[in-house]
């Protein structure tokens, strides 16, 4: 298959690397420098010596693909949606949070939604470390289920599993709970994901964040708390994307995660409010220091 991956961050690089085995993968990036280095050196998984053959183009050079994986941050989706009606390839969105769902109505192509449970760390423009083995889950938003089944059968592999889900809303909700717990806490305390369960003081806060998120989304708390702990354990050495965004002075997905819960809550959720305000404060502090 001809697969396009939009986004040259850690997840975009990881997906491009694994799917390049048996498929023709093109990664679409924002910067000319990254395009050049990938075309020259390929993409390398940090635990492997040999680079993998992947082509790179700039995002505005989007060509016809058999399918597209959208791996940009939540707040970047709106900027690229006008490109999607050009070729109408089936599209798989892999964002944190749920705010991007409101942007999908005007897309004429078949749309699928997914979540990523892997840990990944971008080392440089063409190298990514696979820091936590998990999986990718995909459900249909308005796309043909049989088409999705066919595509997943071609992509799924033991070391990079891709699974089908029936209910996209429940799937995204469960991932939002995980993000609402792990992302702000790891960013605030500067710790890897595993500390969510190994540090008893952080774990106490994590439990309350999970309780609030599950309540807002109408999900079972005990089930979600077990899921959060499982993800934190599987990606225990990973530093969350929010921590990396804070460290590098980039915009975070705070609005799409904690902000989404605050907007949809019908009562006070104090732990989530604290997490939201704290990430805002941390980013402002970083900006002033820089």
Regions found by a protein language model. Name each.
Residues 3, 23-26, 91, 111-112, ...:
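Hydrophobic anchor at the start of a short beta-strand
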Residues 44-127:
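Rossmann-like NAD(P)(H) cofactor-binding subdomain of soluble oxidoreductases
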Residues 88, 127-137, 190-196, 238-248:
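Helix-loop-beta segment of a Rossmann-like dinucleotide-binding subdomain
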